[in-house]
Amino acid sequence: MNPPIARQLNLDETKLPAEIFERLSRRGATLKDYRRRREEAIENFGKPGRDPAELGSVMTTIAGNGVWAANMKLAQLRNHWDQVVGQAIASHSAVADFTDGVLTIRAESTVWATQLTYLIPQLTDTIRRNLKGLTITEIRVTGPAAGYTRKWARRR
């Protein structure tokens, strides 16, 4: 006849019930905690400090912290471009890109690109004054992108 399994596996027979029922006792403890938290939530309902926050204030807090701040300032610059450079220039230019502190402005024509090039010091001061969270190290002005030109093959 075979010896009991506890001896075969070198287990302590006095500890077996505790090992078996440990999982059930942990589950019972979590159920007790769940009931206690539920009762506390019911008791604390409506007390000061538990009022819901307005969505706008929560989103402002989230947008103002972390990596969103620079993107929000850039979006603000794009949306209010006419207030930065004036209506006449804004109708012929736009913010094209912002990467690693370099702001790229795309102009409608080379004439407007030249005009914006002369305004770079004033633009830098205005942007730094109005958008304090946006760090601009350089402003580049580009003219219109060269369109696709097809090279016609000459026939001999």
Curated annotation (Swiss-Prot):
InterPro entries given in the database record: DciA-like, UPF0232_actinobac
**Cited Pfam families:** DciA (PF05258)
Q: What family does the entry list?
A: Belongs to the UPF0232 family.
The protein, known as: UPF0232 protein BL0636
State the organism of origin.
Answer: Bifidobacterium longum (strain NCC 2705)
